């Protein structure tokens, strides 16, 4: 038997090695941070087996004659490069190395090789390797698939601990990565060094790069574009690469792609920004204005001008990057991590040699950002660069936040130059809306009429307070278009009703199918005939709806194509590719526009025929409806002409307010003057003082006015001035001052008007309030606004202010002694009442009220009318039980005589009806005398006492039969309560 050939020098069989301490410990993801990778990192493993199972790394001994084939032997040797430790790698590179054994284990491989490292690198989320390959023009998904296919082709090991040994090729790759680290002058081995190491990997990397046409030069170019001029000086450099791309948004790139909305107007503000940016130092404008006036739009307008070349030489071909402070702060777990990110951003900006301009929206968030546990905040990091002119930065913030944050830091404030952005006028807003119309039409797939744009600007300015143009007008147009789009895509009402009817008849037909009687068969035949008609109509309507929808969809797709062609034309003109621009403009664009005109004409003809089920144009009625939903104003008030509605105001008020003709007339005329546009738009709609004795209808007139103007009595904000008798109680109206309890809650008056700006404000018993309370009313009545305790301006320009007072009521009650109720007597009494008011209220307060209205005391006949009104309310309360109340004229007269008291007005009537009518009705219902759907007659009855006293009159309640009820209602003797 021949002797076995000797093993290669320096190698020991695994059986012999088993006698010595094992040095190849398993290593994997669970390796301790900071510790050596494992002892096996100092060794490389060779698998010796017959048949070439070890691949390139295996050494196959020659066959031995007359002996059994040798078993597979694991042979180890010491690596010459020492230990692999975490300290020499960046965190991302170390993570990929540590997770490689796990990849090998999943694939049932004992030796960790370069292909496992490649898969680990490509599977890192937001990993640097993926970014490098993407920059080099390689599809990462295809690269990962090729790697996995190579791994699957490798032989698998069963029964042993897989993934426990470091392969020779992987060790060589790590050594090459160390060499690239020295070449780049870095302090740590990073992911890019590992990626470059694959280029010389004979096992796997070289062939992979050849298949995907990846060269070392293309990789180095990609790495340089990502790294810039940075060196790896810490263990997290990957987070600082492309910091601007990661934490910012390139507005100039978006402008080139046509993704920014057009900016209309604002030329002065943009020119001022350009002027400040062109300075040598402190070249940092900050845009200050109210929220919604268009500060961010100015930065976008500047980006568009840079792209178009409409800027001075100092700003030509510059990049405008919008910094995302949220992304910058998010995920910064460790102390100093946020500062590292911000420094990386600032370094990229300064390294660009003025080619990059930073835009920080909501710049007040920079002050104090990241300043936790003694760390330096972002504002202090910006200051040196801002002052020296190394960093050009545009900021944007609101007036309040600028004062609260920026002005508190004078060193930061002086580095910024203020550019105030005012709210545009209504005319400018209409121009802005016209410029944006095409974008919103394209997005929603509807048309927006010019009248809708004008209505959006006018109605938002008039009715939506607390927000600013053009933002609130744009929101109106956007929401109206979205509502119309939703209606187009939803099933039309006519079709939906037919669908429901078909389902109902189908269910009825199924239930009648098994019935054999003649009536059921007749009903079944009628249902089938009706179903056939309905289904035919359903089919026609569905086809019509689908046809209209398809035409609208086609129009939208043509518009999108036109928009894309326009962007391409602009890009071609910027690149001076005039042939391409002319070809697009006079070829593709013309063809698309002709196609659009033809399709729109087809749709218009169809809609004008009256058969259309869909509406595809936003009108001013749609805008008005959205305004009503935002503010609570009834939509009919805006859509219906005020002239038509207000002409009947006096008649409507008289349905609820009995008598008081001068008061009702004065209120109606004041409202008509206001709505006709003859009153001051900077003052309340109207302000009245109702003076008169108690119970004559002062508060009722206010409620009736609210029900007519706003369709609900809830629109009355009632404030009882007897609660404001102390001097300090004025703070309850407009809010407590800072430092006092209730400061955050706001005032009772100001909060009510802010929540519901269109209401009637009723100050009841005004003379009972403290004199200092009237000082608040001066600016409300004169300027239509008041500033609350938190500095917010509350507008009263759309409110009706009514004050009631009992001053001089003694003169009104003595009116009969003065000569009855003639006009001359009324004027005389009114003069006396006004004199009494002047003795109570100060002249500057009285001079601001639009009209003083003196209420007359109620007469006996008017009390009867009030009795009928109160009985109608009783009938309303029992209407849900379907009980009808019939009241005779005698009963009305009886109740009126009991409720008449000149000193107390109409209030006793309510008590009388409660005592004589409601109580008796309640007892009758509880006894069972009156049941649901009964008709009850209320009449009077005279009783003669037997003791010789005078006859007495009382109310009696009779249950009427079904036959007598209609006759009694028609008889003149009886009056229905309603």
From Swiss-Prot:
A single Gene Ontology CC annotation of this entry is: chloroplast
- Give positions of region: II: 618-809
Q: What induces it?
A: By heat and oxidative stresses.
* GO BP, sorted A to Z: cellular response to heat; protein refolding
What's in the keyword line of the UniProt record?
ATP-binding, Chaperone, Chloroplast, Nucleotide-binding, Plastid, Repeat, Transit peptide
Where are the coiled-coil regions? Answer: none
Q: Transit peptide: which range? A: 1-76
Task: List residues binding ATP.
Answer: 289-296, 692-699
Q: Where is the Clp R domain?
A: 85-229
Which subcellular locations apply to this protein? Answer: Plastid, Chloroplast
What highest taxon heads this organism's lineage?
Eukaryota
The similarity annotation says:
Belongs to the ClpA/ClpB family.
Q: What is the name listed in the Swiss-Prot or TrEMBL entry for this protein?
A: Chaperone protein ClpB2, chloroplastic
Q: What is the lineage of its organism?
A: Eukaryota, Viridiplantae, Streptophyta, Embryophyta, Tracheophyta
Report which gene this protein is encoded by.
CLPB2
């Amino acid at each position: 038997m021949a002797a076995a050939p000797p093993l290669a020098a320096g190698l020991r069989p695994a059986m012999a090695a088993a006698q010595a301490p094992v040095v190849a410990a398993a290593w994997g993801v669970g390796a301790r941070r900071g510790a050596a990778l494992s002892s096996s990192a100092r060794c490389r493993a060779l698998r010796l087996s017959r048949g070439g199972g070890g691949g390139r790394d295996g050494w196959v001994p020659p066959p031995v004659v007359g002996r059994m084939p040798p078993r597979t032997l694991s042979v180890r040797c010491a690596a010459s490069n020492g230990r692999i430790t975490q300290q020499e790698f960046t965190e991302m590179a170390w993570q990929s190395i540590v997770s490689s054994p796990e990849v090998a284990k999943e694939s049932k491989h004992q030796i960790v090789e370069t292909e496992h490292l490649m898969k680990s690198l490509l599977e890192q989320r937001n990993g640097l390797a993926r970014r490098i390959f993407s920059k080099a023009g390689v599809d990462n998904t295809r690269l990962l698939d090729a790697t996995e296919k190579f791994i699957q082709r490798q032989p698998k090991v069963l029964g042993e601990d897989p993934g426990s040994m470091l392969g020779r090729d992987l060790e060589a790759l790590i050594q090459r990565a160390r060499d690239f680290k020295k070449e780049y002058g870095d302090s740590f081995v990073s992911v890019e060094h590992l990626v470059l190491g694959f280029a010389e990997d004979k096992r796997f990397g070289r062939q992979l790069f050849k298949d995907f046409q990846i060269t070392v030069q293309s990789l180095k170019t990609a790495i340089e574009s990502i790294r810039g001029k940075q060196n790896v000086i810490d263990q997290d450099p990957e987070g600082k690469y492309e910091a601007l791309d990661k934490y910012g948004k390139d507005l100039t790139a978006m402008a080139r792609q046509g993704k920014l909305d057009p900016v209309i107007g604002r030329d002065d503000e943009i020119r001022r920004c350009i002027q400040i940016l062109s300075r040598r130092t402190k070249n940092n404008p900050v845009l200050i204005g109210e929220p919604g006036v268009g500060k961010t739009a100015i930065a976008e307008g500047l980006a568009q001008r840079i792209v178009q070349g409409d800027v001075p030489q100092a700003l030509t071909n510059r990049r405008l990057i919008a910094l995302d402070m949220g992304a910058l702060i998010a995920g910064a777990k460790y102390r100093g991590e946020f500062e590292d990110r911000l420094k990386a951003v600032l370094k990229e900006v300064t390294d660009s040699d003025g080619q990059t301009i930073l835009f920080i929206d909501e710049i007040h968030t920079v002050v104090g950002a990241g300043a936790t546990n003694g760390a330096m905040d972002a504002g202090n990091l910006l200051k040196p660069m801002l002052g020296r002119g190394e960093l050009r930065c545009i900021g944007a913030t609101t007036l309040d936040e600028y004062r609260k944050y920026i002005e508190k830091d004078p060193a930061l404030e002086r580095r910024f130059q203020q550019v105030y952005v005012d709210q545009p006028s209504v005319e400018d807003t209409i121009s802005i809306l016209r410029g944006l119309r095409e974008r919103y039409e394209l997005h929603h797939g509807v048309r927006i009429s010019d009248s809708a744009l004008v209505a959006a600007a006018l109605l938002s300015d008039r009715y939506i307070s607390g927000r600013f143009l053009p933002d609130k007008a744009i929101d109106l147009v956007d929401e109206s278009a979205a509502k119309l789009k939703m209606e187009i895509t939803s099933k039309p009402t006519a079709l939906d009703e037919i669908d429901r009817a078909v389902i109902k008849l189908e269910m009825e037909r199924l239930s009648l199918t098994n019935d054999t009687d003649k009536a059921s068969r007749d009903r079944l035949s009628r249902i089938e005939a009706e179903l056939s008609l309905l289904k035919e109509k359903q089919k026609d309507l569905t086809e019509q709806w689908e046809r209209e929808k398809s035409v609208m969809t086609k129009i939208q797709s043509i518009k999108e194509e036109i928009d894309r062609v326009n962007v391409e034309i602009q890009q071609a003109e910027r690149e001076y590719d005039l042939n391409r621009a002319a070809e697009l403009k006079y070829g593709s664009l013309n063809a698309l526009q002709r196609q659009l005109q033809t399709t729109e004409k087809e749709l218009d003809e169809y809609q004008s025929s009256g058969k259309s089920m869909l509406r595809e144009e936003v009108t001013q009625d749609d805008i008005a409806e959205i305004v009503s939903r935002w503010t609570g104003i009834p939509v009919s008030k805006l859509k219906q002409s005020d002239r038509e509605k207000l002409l009947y105001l006096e008649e409507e008020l008289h349905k609820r307010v009995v008598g008081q003709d001068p008061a009702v007339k004065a209120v109606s005329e004041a409202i008509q003057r206001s709505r006709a546009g003859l009153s001051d738009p900077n003052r309340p709609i109207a302000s009245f003082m109702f003076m008169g004795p108690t119970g004559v209808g002062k508060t009722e007139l206010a409620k009736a006015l609210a029900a007519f103007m706003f369709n609900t009595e809830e629109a009355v904000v009632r404030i009882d001035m007897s609660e404001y008798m102390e001097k300090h109680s004025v703070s309850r109206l407009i809010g407590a001052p800072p430092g006092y309890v209730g400061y955050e809650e706001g005032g009772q008056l100001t909060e009510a008007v802010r929540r519901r700006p269109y209401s009637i404000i009723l100050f009841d018993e005004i003379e009972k309030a403290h004199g200092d309370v009237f000082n608040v009313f001066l600016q409300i009545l004169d300027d239509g606004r008041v500033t609350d305790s938190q500095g917010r301006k509350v507008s009263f320009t759309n409110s009706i202010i009514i004050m009631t007072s009992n001053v001089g009521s003694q003169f009104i009650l003595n009116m009969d002694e003065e000569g009855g109720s003639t006009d001359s007597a009324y004027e005389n009494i009114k003069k006396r009442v006004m004199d009494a008011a002047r003795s109570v209220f100060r002249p500057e307060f009285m001079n601001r009220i639009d009209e003083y209205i003196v209420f007359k005391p109620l007469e006996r006949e008017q009390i009867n009318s009030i009795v009928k009104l109160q009985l109608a309310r009783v009938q309303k309360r029992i209407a849900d039980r379907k009980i009808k109340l019939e009241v005779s004229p005698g009963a009305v007269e009886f109740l009126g005589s009991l409720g008449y008291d000149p000193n107390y007005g109409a209030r006793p009537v309510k008590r009388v009806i409660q005592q004589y009518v409601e109580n008796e009705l309640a007892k009758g219902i509880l006894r069972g005398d009156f049941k649901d759907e009964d008709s009850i007659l209320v009449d009077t009855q005279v009783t003669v006492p037997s003791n010789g006293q005078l006859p007495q009159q009382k109310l009696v309640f009779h249950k009427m039969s079904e036959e007598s009820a209609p006759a009694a209602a028609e008889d003149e003797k009886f009056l229905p309560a309603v």
